[in-house]
Amino acid sequence: MIIERLTGNLRDLNPLDFKVDYVDLEWFETRKKIARFKTRQGKDIAIRLKDAPKLGLSQGDILFKEEKEIIAINILDSEVIHIQAKSVAEVAKICYEIGNRHATLYYGESQFEFKTPFEKPTLALLEKLGVQNRVLSSKLDSKERLTVSMPHNEPNFKVSLASDFKVVMK
């Protein structure tokens, strides 16, 4: 089965009205536009998203819906550093340092709380900066992601040289 478009999200439906099968993804797999997966019930799924969400796939995104059957995304829990800032200045420092490492940053559950995937060097940096943090297991859902840039995107247009193209060296 090839999926080219998302058809909604489970949060907009009553999941009890449907037979729901899930595709379990790690947080870093949610930004894939082309991939193959197996559902929990063993169905082969291929995605080739034409209009992929800028932030990536989110918890509960519906890949397939037909009558009473749904195949949806489940983002697996992973080891995460929960960061609690004490001030706006500390928020700026956290965002700068995490961004400088090109690490992913997510909003947390409360104001001034952030999450980032666990990496020992990041944890050591936060300790060195004196930023309050703890390592927990939780979901990193794309809808809570602070950054939206997608590295190495392919252009959706064709480039060709004009017939009168010339290179002039001076």
Curated annotation (Swiss-Prot):
Name of the molecule in the record: Urease accessory protein UreE
Function field: Involved in urease metallocenter assembly. Binds nickel. Probably functions as a nickel donor during metallocenter assembly.
UniProt keyword terms in alphabetical order: Chaperone, Cytoplasm, Nickel, Nickel insertion
Any one GO MF annotation of this record: nickel cation binding
InterPro entries: UreE, UreE_C_dom, UreE_N, UreE_N_sf
UniProt xrefs under SUPFAM superfamilies: Urease metallochaperone UreE, C-terminal domain, Urease metallochaperone UreE, N-terminal domain
Keyword match Transmembrane helix: no
Subcellular location: Cytoplasm
Family in the record: Belongs to the UreE family.
NCBIfam families: PRK13261.1-6
Swiss-Prot/TrEMBL GO biological process terms: protein folding; protein-containing complex assembly; urea metabolic process
Species of provenance: Helicobacter acinonychis (strain Sheeba)
GO CC field: cytoplasm
